[in-house]
Amino acid sequence: MPTYAPKAGDTTCSWYVIDATDVVLGRLAAVAATLLRGKHKPTFAPNVDGGDFVIVINADKVAISGDKVQHKMVYRHSGYPGGLRKRTIGELMQKHPDRVVEKAIVGMLPKNKLSRQIQRKLRVYAGPDHPHSAQQPVPFEIKQVAQ
């Protein structure tokens, strides 16, 4: 019997909604990246996008462990001399908490040809509401020890 190799249309995509309230950012990102890639499915193949859609709500209530809120820096550069800009994670969480969570999840995805396609399946919202109720997302519970 030959080995089964899934093709692009062979797998069905589900929608999951993850509540990020009091969930540690790294653990949330690892679980979301696993769902996005489809590694939880028996038909996983690294060369086929067989992952599920993931909606993360309450990104503004995610927990960042340790003193990273004050000390972890995020850098960006304008391309001009002296154009290095840096902010702490705490400053970014006040303005754009959805971007912080999205960057953490995207950082745990592979950097290859499928990465953009996988990133399109991720939706992050700062509040408790999302516009994807028509897709009937299934709540996904992250099991963790209380903070």
UniProtKB/Swiss-Prot annotation:
Gene Ontology cellular component annotations, sorted alphabetically: cytosolic large ribosomal subunit
GO molecular function, one term: structural constituent of ribosome
Keywords, alphabetical: Ribonucleoprotein, Ribosomal protein
Disulfide-bonded cysteines: none
A Gene Ontology biological process term: translation
Known function: This protein is one of the early assembly proteins of the 50S ribosomal subunit, although it is not seen to bind rRNA by itself. It is important during the early stages of 50S assembly.
PANTHER family: LARGE RIBOSOMAL SUBUNIT PROTEIN UL13M, RIBOSOMAL PROTEIN L13
Homology family: Belongs to the universal ribosomal protein uL13 family.
HAMAP family: Ribosomal_uL13
Subunit comment: Part of the 50S ribosomal subunit.
UniProt-recorded name of the protein: Large ribosomal subunit protein uL13
